Amino acid sequence: MLYPQHFDVIVVGGGHAGTEAALAAARMGCKTLLLSHNIETLGQMSCNPSIGGIGKGHLVKEVDALGGAMAAATDEGGIQFRILNSSKGPAVRATRAQADRLLYKAAIRRRLENQPNLWLFQQAVDDLMVEGDRVVGAVTQAGIKFRAKTVVLTAGTFLDGKIHVGLNNYAAGRAGDPPAVRLSARLKELKLPQGRLKTGTPPRLDGRSIDFSKCGEQPGDGMPGGMSPVMPVFSFMGRVEQHPPQMSCWTTHTNERTHEIIRSGFDRSPMFTGKIEGVGPRYCPSVEDKINRFADKDSHQIFLEPEGLTTNEYYPNGISTSLPFDIQYALVRSMAGLENAHILRPGYAIEYDYFDPQQLKSSFETRAIGGLFFAGQINGTTGYEEAAAQGLFAGVNAALQAGAQTSWQQETWVPGRDEAYLGVLVDDLITKGVTEPYRMFTSRAEFRLQLREDNADMRLTETGRRLGLVDDARWEAFSRKREAVSRETERLRSLWVSPKNLTATESERVLGKSIEHEYSLADLLRRPDVNYANLMSLEGGKYASAELNIPVSRETPAVPLPEAVFAAVVIEQVEIVAKYAGYIDRQIEEVGRAAHYENLKLPLELDYLQVSALSFEARQKLSKHRPETLGQASRLSGITPAAISLLLVHLKKSNFKGFAAAGKVTAPSESGDVQQGVI
């Protein structure tokens, strides 16, 4: 039957990508339908019980700055919080949280069920309704047809999924869930380029059978013995009192006996016997892959992570495996503290279809089928955080195409590489594609000094407001913070000290040496050995801000007052901006030089095969990938700065719109530097 109600946006799949996509489209005012094979598993953490980490935490903060759910759900479900790289610069500091699976899933479900404009429906999708070259809806396994203006596919590992344990394998989307075989076949019928990838998960352990006295304890920040006495929050709107009771993680190690056991199972490993065709994640390898690749290492650290407050289940992070169960049993029991460990669920690898993200437009709409958007593992990525960010992004663009009424004046929203890690993620996928599951690192962002966790709201919340993603409460909180940062920055610039009014003793106490001429407090704060608190102690606190002079205790994990938290956040932002101003200014100059190419749209009718000045390889790659801008073209593998210059010459001679007036140009080199050239 044809369902009588029509929708603006249909989202297929209720994982981390699907839930963020559906919430985003609904927040923008679109009538949105979320289809899932099982609404009891909406927001389920299929693998590890954690959110965030290096690069990944940055994405979560960006999703949150745009009104997304992941960070807020983690604050409500997180049972351990840590700031990674806390001793390093702010650009690479990252929040990571262990989450109670049930609490996290419940927090996501609650948001979905209370979101206006959002409908849930439990049915697996087997087919897409396509008219001409445009999608117009989806068909469920029961034959129910739902019509919509746009469709977002977020199928995760379900597309023709196959689970491997040793030499045994069976069809599944994940353990306990059926695969989406018919939907995968339908996508292949549409001639969308696809491949196979794989990922894996470790066996789960019963905590009652673990001897924790033989393991190392790893408490979180704000817990007794933690690295910091201050407990973090993930969301910009989060509060520490939202966190449930906290738990420690634990560590153990593999040993030579463990490695011998693993090697003894290589002849029955689906990885080494050719049973698995898909490529696995380089940065989250299986334990058998680690032992094979790093044969010189005699030990690997394993983290025992609690799955929740109401379960004894533990996730042994570091021993993801598809080895036969008898090998899994033996390798687990070969480690200290796990000699009597009981396995609750076996580890496994899962192989699944993905579709080449280079066939997507920059909005994540497929080039072949109008109105069809992809997000998450279907694009070749791995990780909850990468999926959530893509889901929000695809949901926004699907909503814009469906006619969302917002103050955004453009047909699509695509953040630049200098604006967000989400922009880096999108650009990497559509220009470089994937040959293995893609995960985010801070090293992928050339402008990472600007793309910090602490300023994700400063970068994106105003855009989110224009897109209709940000509610009044978040907007008011953000505006208050932004105004306070601006006021304090200007105040520090306006206050001056000189040798006349600052004694040498006082100067040496705070600044390390006496000053020789007049300085503003903003200038002094730029010094690496001067922090805000010390600066405000000058002359008995004479220069302290009445607005921000609220003490925050760092001696105990007690919950500080909201005003003290606000003051600490503002002070952190003021101090970081002051200390990194020179570096950030240089990056802004680089962004400006590159912006010319990002704004030069390549003509849709351009036949690259006829640009005879280009090498055959360059013509082939440009024809295949059809980059939307000159900036995208410059980042394609095999496209050199010389090729970009030659392409510019051709465009100018051919009088394509926007290129006829080109004169002196700056062609980006493969290293990202800028080279001067003339055409």
Swiss-Prot record:
It is found in: Cytoplasm. InterPro entries: FAD/NAD-bd_sf, GIDA_C_N, MnmG, MnmG-rel, MnmG-rel_CS, MnmG_C, MnmG_C_subdom, MnmG_C_subdom_sf. Keywords: Cytoplasm, FAD, Flavoprotein, NAD, tRNA processing. Pfam families: GIDA, GIDA_C_1st, SAM_GIDA_C. GO terms for cellular component: cytosol. The keyword tRNA processing applies. Gene3D superfamilies: FAD/NAD(P)-binding domain, GidA associated domain, C-terminal subdomain, tRNA uridine 5-carboxymethylaminomethyl modification enzyme MnmG/GidA. Its main location: cytoplasm. Homodimer. Heterotetramer of two MnmE and two MnmG subunits. Belongs to the MnmG family. This is tRNA uridine 5-carboxymethylaminomethyl modification enzyme MnmG. It comes from Albidiferax ferrireducens (strain ATCC BAA-621 / DSM 15236 / T118) (Rhodoferax ferrireducens). The lineage of its organism: Bacteria, Pseudomonadati, Pseudomonadota, Betaproteobacteria, Burkholderiales.
